[in-house]
Curated annotation (Swiss-Prot):
Designated name of the protein: Putative F-box protein At1g60370
GO biological process: root development
Annotated ranges, domain F-box: 4-53
Organism: Arabidopsis thaliana
Any GO CC annotation of this UniProt entry: nucleus
Amino acid sequence: MNGGEKLESIPIDLIIEIHSRLPAESVARFRCVSKLWGSMFRRPYFTELFLTRSRARPRLLFVLQHNRKWSFSVFSSPQNQNIYEKPSFVVADFHMKFSVSTFPDFHSCSGLIHFSMMKGAYTVPVVCNPRTGQYAVLPKLTRTRYENSYSFVGYDPIEKQIKVLFMSDPDSGDDHRILTLGTTEKMLGRKIECSLTHNILSNEGVCINGVLYYKASRIVESSSDDDTSDDDDDDHERSDVIVCFDFRCEKFEFIVICFYGQLINSVQLSLKQKSHQKLDLII
């Protein structure tokens, strides 16, 4: 090649193909190379291609809470896909350390971690990508007189979007909202309606194929005709439900259950050590 000849630019399709095989940390760094590369790696096509290949090599996510230091560290390691293969020791990769002023309650979806932390006098939700180190502190949507609110993160597999559902406490009104991350949408989100007033029992939710499931309870009038009770509360009985929220159509459905239990998919396996550290394996 003569010195005066210019190298032909690499086709964008080839760049996307190459970088879709790289770790998330590398992709995050390459997004900062230029505006062109940043926009290229934000394309829905690249996101879907990268997620598809990432699912083919799943990883276990470990969260180590330092109880005395009010902080936690995030690690991950490859997940063995061959159950017949002889187990081997694997060194977990360190991703990030985060300091919080309260014990966060973790759950995850599509590689993101969702937890709560103290900001001033109030608890605010945080969504974090441990592989890239990026995080977003989300707004507290309820007014200051509201005591409690809950938030859940989920993935819309059709539109390829990460969304956050905010649910206010029943005593605080019906200010429920949905926020789509990575858009120009206002951080206050869009208000949505829920036909069933319910008490959320835990902010541990499970998102499967774009549908969020979480535990809740409602108060219903008792069908009993027994008037011998002196307690007005006996005129009502508790009804446990599983709330189903479809992130695609942004609609609620409800499954009435006759017993109280725990969503086993949301269980975090915890191991407390003598050093006052707790290791959570998020499934």
